[in-house]
Amino acid sequence: MARVARVTEIVAGSPDSFDDAIKTGFERACKTLRGITGVRVLEQRVKVADNKMVEYRVRMEIIFVLEG
């Protein structure tokens, strides 16, 4: 059976770590997307304020299979 997948891009952040930002983004995507088959982290950035790292940000693709 043939399948068709879609890719959507999201940005997530965490004050603690890149790993936590990825987890936060994935958990949020799971609330609205069904059939997730993969995640690809495209970019990692750090927000800086007053010479301190204040937020870890990731840009990621969420891959999921379309229904029907």
Task: Tell what function each PLM region has.
Residues Q44-G68:
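A cross-kingdom feature marking charged/low-complexity
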Residues M1-A2, I62:
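Short N-terminal signal/transit or membrane-insertion segments
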Residues A2-T37:
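Short, well-ordered alpha-helical segments
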